[in-house]
């Protein structure tokens, strides 16, 4: 049984602790720290986490909103402090500015070395195929941006990825990951083609490309 304390920030950490102990006493297994307005700063959130951990054995979860673009960061903070449940959604779909992005958080956890039983590229495809078409405005979670951040791939090389992935009919996301694993400082078309050929042999099949807007990436942005 979980209790969701909406607008947790509206009460002090001490009051939150008292309420948590009360609901735990009457049967709740877990309490949620809830950033309903998406305005909790990490150090503020951590006050609620620490007072609960130091004064009880009650499990906790976190539900964040992204009004100040901190929902994923705050989710990571709670995970590092032992949270049992983190609320997330594909494309960060949710009220107001939305919730923590499932896609982004998965790749953040992978960057931190977590071994996850999930195919992140399939997750991105599901999000693009089923969630984005339902949204009234374009999704905030762009696959190429996530992959670039995860792989530490500089976006000025996107024209190379665009050209080579089209030439070899490869998913640009997979090509970015493979190229960046080999080279981060100076990505050439020759290198990308060499890696693309190896990917093609490994896959033994054509990969359907999504319609990515490569034109929004500035070619010479490293010159600035």
Set out the residue ranges of the language-model regions.
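Catalytic cores and adjacent flexible loops of soluble metabolic enzymes
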Residues: 1-224
């Amino acid at each position: 049984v979980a209790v969701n304390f909406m607008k947790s920030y509206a009460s002090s950490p001490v009051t939150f602790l008292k309420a948590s102990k009360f609901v735990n006493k009457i049967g709740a297994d877990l309490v949620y720290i809830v950033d309903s307005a998406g305005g909790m700063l990490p150090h503020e959130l951590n006050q609620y986490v620490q007072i609960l951990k130091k004064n009880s054995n009650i499990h906790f979860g976190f539900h964040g909103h992204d009004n100040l673009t901190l929902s994923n960061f705050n989710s990571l903070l709670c995970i590092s402090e032992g949270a049992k449940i983190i609320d997330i959604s594909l494309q960060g779909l949710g009220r107001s500015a939305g919730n923590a992005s499932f896609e982004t958080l998965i790749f953040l956890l992978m960057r931190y070395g977590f071994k996850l039983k999930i195919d992140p590229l399939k997750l991105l495809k599901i999000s693009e195929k089923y969630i984005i078409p339902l949204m009234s405005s374009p999704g905030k979670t762009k696959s190429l941006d996530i992959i670039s951040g995860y792989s530490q791939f500089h976006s000025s090389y996107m024209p190379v990825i665009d050209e080579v992935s089209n030439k070899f009919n490869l998913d640009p996301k997979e090509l970015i990951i493979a190229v960046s694993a080999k080279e981060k400082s100076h990505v050439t078309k020759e290198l990308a083609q060499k890696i693309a050929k190896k990917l093609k042999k490994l896959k033994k099949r054509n990969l359907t490309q999504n319609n990515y807007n490569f034109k929004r990436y500035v070619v010479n942005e490293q010159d600035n």
